[in-house]
A protein has these predicted regions:
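Outer-membrane beta-barrel transmembrane strands
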Residues: 90, 158-175, 183-185, 210-249, ...
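Flexible loop and strand-edge segments within Gram-negative outer membrane beta-barrel domains
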Residues: 179-218
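Flexible, surface-exposed loop regions and adjacent strand-edge segments
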Residues: 124-132, 187, 196-205, 241, ...
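Transmembrane beta-barrel wall of Gram-negative outer-membrane proteins
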Residues: 84-191, 219-221
């Protein structure tokens, strides 16, 4: 979604919800794995105070399937794919619904493991040469012009993407008017290099000098209590959300171009 930012810190103007749990973050939003999902609601903006901050441009609400009373269910979904230009891929998930107390209590468990095989090759190359010799002028360039090669990180299919996680939910039908849902979700994402390539180097090829990665790890817990009060509907949502994000992107050639054109030594008196 769109963001408003100052420097490197961005605040989203569109909100993302997983059931009643707000998972909107600064900058890029978490990518929820679409397993055992009932529906997705796209609510046009601007939204009011029901969804709070970050809803000026709208709200995306992902609704999961809830535990079903008196139903025993097992769902397996497995797929395998191959590619002529890269590594193979797979996608597997399992859904289990377990009734615990008749008409009162049920649990639902979801687990998934998926991998998208890479198809971008990091081929051998050297850094660009620049006539301005900005390394001597600037003094902070990490390598000499035209001398650094990427022999240590040359590899095929560097842009693979892996995701694993699980979701556990417990639903209690307290009576005809009251219900409670307790949910916990964990998801880990481990991606390699970015999927762009340089057509001047070759088809699906690029020259990168550092190992790239993008990793996320998030945990979510929520307790939602709903009630029919007769004169109104009550929805109480209490949640905890924690996300760790780390990434590394190679900008060696960009740094060299920047240094050459913007770091100029002016002659003094």
């Amino acid at each position: 979604g769109a963001t408003t930012s100052s420097g490197y810190v961005g605040q989203s103007t569109s909100a993302v919800y997983l059931d009643e749990l707000a998972i909107t973050t600064s900058g890029q939003q978490p990518s929820v794995r679409m397993v055992d999902i009932a529906r997705i609601e796209a609510l046009a903006g601007p939204q009011g105070t029901l969804y709070g901050a970050d809803s000026q441009a709208g709200t995306l609400k992902i609704i999961t399937n809830k535990p079903e009373m008196n139903v025993s269910e097992l769902i397996l979904d497995i797929s395998v794919r191959d590619s002529s230009e890269g590594k193979g891929s797979h996608d597997g998930s399992i859904v289990v619904n377990i009734p615990l107390i008749e008409d009162k209590l049920a649990a639902r468990f979801v687990a998934f493991d998926a991998k998208d095989g890479g198809f971008i090759d990091n081929v051998y190359g050297k850094t660009i040469t620049n006539d301005l010799k900005a390394d001597a002028l600037y003094g902070r360039s990490p390598s000499g012009w035209g001398t650094l090669d990427n022999a240590d990180v040359v590899e095929d299919d560097i842009n693979d993407h892996k995701v694993t996680g699980w979701r556990a939910a417990l639903r209690w039908e307290i009576n005809d008017q009251w219900s409670a849902d307790l949910t916990h979700i964990q998801q880990k994402t481990d991606s390699g290099s970015y999927s762009g390539f340089d057509p001047n180097v070759g088809d699906l090829q690029d020259i990168r000098y550092n190992e790239e990665f993008y990793k996320t790890d998030y945990n979510m817990s929520s307790l939602v209590i709903e009630a029919d009060l007769g004169f109104a509907q009550l929805v109480s949502a209490t949640s905890y959300y924690d996300q760790d994000l780390s990434f590394n992107q190679d900008i060696t050639n960009y740094h060299k171009s920047y240094s050459a054109y913007y770091c100029i030594e002016y002659a003094g008196d």
